[in-house]
Swiss-Prot record:
<comment type="subunit">
    <text>Interacts with RIP1.</text>
</comment>
<comment type="similarity">
    <text>Belongs to the complex I LYR family. MZM1 subfamily.</text>
</comment>
<dbReference type="InterPro" id="IPR050435">
    <property type="entry name" value="MZM1/LYRM7"/>
</dbReference>
<dbReference type="InterPro" id="IPR045298">
    <property type="entry name" value="Complex1_LYR_LYRM7"/>
</dbReference>
<keyword id="KW-0809">Transit peptide</keyword>
<feature type="transit peptide" description="Mitochondrion">
    <location>
        <begin position="1"/>
        <end position="23"/>
    </location>
</feature>
<protein>
    <recommendedName>
        <fullName>Mitochondrial zinc maintenance protein 1, mitochondrial</fullName>
    </recommendedName>
</protein>
<keyword id="KW-0143">Chaperone</keyword>
<dbReference type="GO" id="GO:0005759">
    <property type="term" value="C:mitochondrial matrix"/>
</dbReference>
<keyword id="KW-0496">Mitochondrion</keyword>
<dbReference type="GO" id="GO:0044183">
    <property type="term" value="F:protein folding chaperone"/>
</dbReference>
<dbReference type="GO" id="GO:0034551">
    <property type="term" value="P:mitochondrial respiratory chain complex III assembly"/>
</dbReference>
<comment type="function">
    <text>Assembly factor required for Rieske Fe-S protein RIP1 incorporation into the cytochrome b-c1 (CIII) complex. Functions as a chaperone, binding to this subunit within the mitochondrial matrix and stabilizing it prior to its translocation and insertion into the late CIII dimeric intermediate within the mitochondrial inner membrane. Modulates the mitochondrial matrix zinc pool.</text>
</comment>
Length: 115
């Protein structure tokens, strides 16, 4: 692995670990599982390959999705009627809901979800 590729892989790994810390800081079992999964994937792809750059980009994209789009919810254990409390941190992407404001217009789907 070239020096620049190794540095990029380390940077992506650190970004992924930081993102798991931000998103799962109140949920230790999930935090540990997410970090183990990241470690296993990086160890599995330790040797340089043709798609190493793609794998590094994938790790960076996963870190960004975790950091900007994943919100954890929790409620008191044993109380199924309790309200959910969401852990919305500063880096969560917030939408403006413009599509909801349009109202009463037919939504056209141009292709199937699986394609």
């Amino acid at each position: 692995m070239t020096t620049s590729t190794a540095a990029a892989a380390k940077s992506a790994y650190r970004q992924l670990l930081r993102s798991t810390r931000v998103v799962f800081h109140n949920d230790l079992p999930v935090l540990i599982a997410a970090r183990q999964e990241a470690r296993q994937n990086f160890e599995k792809n330790r040797r340089p390959a043709v798609d190493t750059g793609m794998q590094i980009n994938h790790a960076i994209e996963v870190a960004n999705i975790l950091r900007h789009n994943i919100v954890q919810g929790s409620r008191e254990q044993g109380d199924e009627t309790a309200k959910w409390e969401l852990n919305i941190h500063d880096q969560i992407e917030r939408g403006d809901n413009d599509s909801i404001k349009v109202g009463n217009q037919d939504v056209k789907i141009h292709k199937a979800c699986s394609s």
